[in-house]
Design a protein with these regions (language model features):
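Active-site helical microenvironments for divalent-metal-assisted chemistry
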Residues: 1-187
Length: 187
């Protein structure tokens, strides 16, 4: 899959959808995330994942039809059904892993809270997918313009927890994104 194809699919599946403000076309969010991933040196695959990162959350039925699947009932099933499809190649696994809305562990979220769940997602992400998720968080913070304080606070706590507990090697891009999320410094 190339970036143009990913963008086309995202535009198709988000057509007619709007952000929470009811005015901004939803496609502006994946566009912003893909732009940040590109700006921070993400691979072509990572940019594709950025364009597609919300397709299951926002249009599961359209995604199912587009992919020619009878049903999409779980992340694991989706990955199994899509194995070997050259047109989606390596994008699929990363797309499934980055989605915190697809098949979240509701019991874990209830027991530990959303912040811990997000921190765990960050800790287990590959370097490429960490870049996409951090760009997604930063784009959401920027787009909210202070109107979603609880989400911003949750993101900051999760990123702070991740940066204190994480032992993975962070790239300069990761470090800059973490600083931007924590400090709200323009990036």
């Amino acid at each position: 899959m190339n970036i143009e194809t990913a963008e086309k699919i995202a535009r198709q599946l988000h057509e007619g959808q709007f952000r929470a403000d009811g005015v901004t076309p939803y496609i502006e969010h994946p566009k912003a995330v893909a732009g940040l991933v590109k700006e921070y040196g993400g691979s072509e695959k990572s940019i594709c994942v950025a364009w597609l990162h919300d397709i299951m959350e926002e249009n599961a039925e359209g995604t199912r039809k587009l992919l020619g699947l009878n049903r999409i009932d779980s992340k694991a099933r989706f990955i199994m059904d899509m194995r070997g499809r050259e047109d989606w190649s390596g994008v699929l696994f990363d797309l499934a892993r980055i989605s915190d809305h697809w098949e979240p562990d509701q019991k874990e979220i209830k027991e530990r809270g959303k912040v811990v769940y997000l921190a765990k997602l960050l800790l287990t992400a590959s370097s490429d997918m960490l870049l996409v998720k951090l760009c997604d968080m930063l784009a959401n913070i920027r787009e909210s313009k202070g109107t979603r304080k609880s989400q911003e606070k949750r993101y900051r706590k999760a990123v702070r927890c991740f940066s204190e507990l994480g032992d993975k090697s962070l790239t300069e891009a990761h470090k800059k994104l973490i600083a931007a999320i924590l400090d709200r410094t323009p990036v």
